[in-house]
Amino acid sequence: MASGRLIKLVIFELLEFAAFSIPTLVIMEQFATAYQRTRNASEKTHYWLIVSCSIAYVAVVSLLIWVPVKVLLHKKRHLYKKIKGWRPVMMMCVVLTTLPSFIFSIAVTEVQKTINTTVDVLPDTLPDLPVSLVISSLIITDIIEKLRFHPIRGYQKSNEDKHIHTSSLQQVRTVTEQVRQNGENAASPCAASPSETWQPPGALTHSAVPMFAGPQEPFFGSGILKTMSRRDVRAEIFLWSFLLWSDTIEMVRVAGHPNVYKTNWLYPVYLFSFISLLRIIFTPQNPLLSCLGILLQDLPFVFVRLSLIIALGTITPVLGLCKNVLVTLSYVYFNFLTRFRAFSNFELSPF
């Protein structure tokens, strides 16, 4: 009987291969259908030629790149120690699947423009399935790569739960130490002279600042509230993996607007959407992810969304533009401007 680890490995590999191959086949079939309309409708030669080329591409890439890399990483596990900061599987998905899919999605639109000779007779919106399938497959592959390091069965606490529990212990320990220090000070009234203990107002230490600047997080030990407060780290992987790419998903959906895909605005929207997806190549705990999130997504999206709003109106949500602007400004302020003297004054008030 197969072990649970082997079953998990087989299921994960099959899901990843499906996410790697299916988007390319779907996009290429859509391109073949659009291209066939430019030819004789009774003949399917061009259609089947393009479909067969897409199948051949997936087969060649899988046999020459995907399978060898997968086998090498599985057999030579020590190679993971030499790979720092990025993930080979996600690199293959982005370069070999996502990039061709985006290119042929643009090609489908161009072929439709060639068929109709005018943009006025084009469909009102682009089909959402192909592009959504590409991004969903990429996110699913990312989730699988994260779940490899977690067991499928059993219960695992969320990291945030552990942080709250640790913070509570630290707060209890701090209060106990303060009470003990107050007792020692009261027991020794013969302290140092005022000239030795006096400090100027600007020389207050960090311990003088109140520790509890906000409301405390509740903790439920039993009952229905404990059941409702359960958070498993594996479920949160699914949640945050989709939330992380919601901005890119919204930007890609803008490409389906008739005022975008019927004009040259389609190119910058797809280009910067693909650039933002490059962040998925890096490991989840990479220290460069915050900076890359600004450089590859938020900052470019500010200019793209602002240009779209100025040229075409509010076809992209203003909330998305506000998010990109605020995230970019907050990153620059808290990471760089606060290092200057004018922004580095110590705050005595917790409010």
From Swiss-Prot:
Tissue and organ distribution: Intestine.
Membrane topology annotation: Multi-pass membrane protein
Keyword Protein transport recorded: no
Transmembrane regions listed in the UniProt entry: 9-29, 49-69, 88-108, 121-141, 264-284, 301-321
Stored InterPro entries: Uncharacterised_FAM23-like_TM
GO CC field: membrane
Glycosylation sites: 116
Compartment(s) where it occurs, according to its Swiss-Prot or TrEMBL record: Membrane
Keywords: Glycoprotein, Membrane, Transmembrane, Transmembrane helix
Family affiliation: Belongs to the TMEM236 family.
Name of protein: Transmembrane protein 236
Name of the gene encoding the protein in the UniProt record: TMEM236
